[in-house]
Amino acid sequence: MPSLRGLSIAAIAAGALFASPALAHPKLVSTTPAADASVETPSRITLTFSERLMPRLSGVEVIMTGMPGMPNHRMAVTGFQTSTGADGKTLIVALPRPLTTGSYQVTWHAVSADTHRIEGNFAFAVK
């Protein structure tokens, strides 16, 4: 007959095994435009994560980091609307107008059910 100690250890190990996915942080899976891409004038930016997000606690900042003739010109892009896609895993940044030629950095933060905030950034260029 299994001992109480052995059963306890097995229960803890099984709990840890099955609880791990629930405690995982969301990971950025893909972006449009892709990181380091050079694209035509986008009218929206999307970020897809590995888990459903808490929309009120997740968001982005879009900065123009350079433009033709002014490589170190930093200017915030304003007036965009952020929403969550039907899958709950995609942040959609609807820009008020297509982005102009230059380089851009998107800084994001995301929170899922585990309530831990993760953050990161990626850059792309507009031709």
Across the structure, where does each feature detected by a protein language model lie?
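Bacterial N-terminal signal peptides that target proteins for export
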Residues: 1-11
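Intrinsically disordered, low-complexity terminal tails and linkers in eukaryotic proteins, enriched
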Residues: 11, 23-25, 60, 65
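N-terminal signal peptide c-region/cleavage motif recognized by signal peptidases
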Residues: 19-21
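N-terminal edge beta-strand
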Residues: 23-42
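Acidic, low-complexity Ser/Thr/Gly/Pro-rich repeat segments typical of extracellular/periplasmic
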Residues: 37-40, 54-125
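Short edge beta-strand/loop segments characteristic of extracellular beta-sandwich folds
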Residues: 44-52
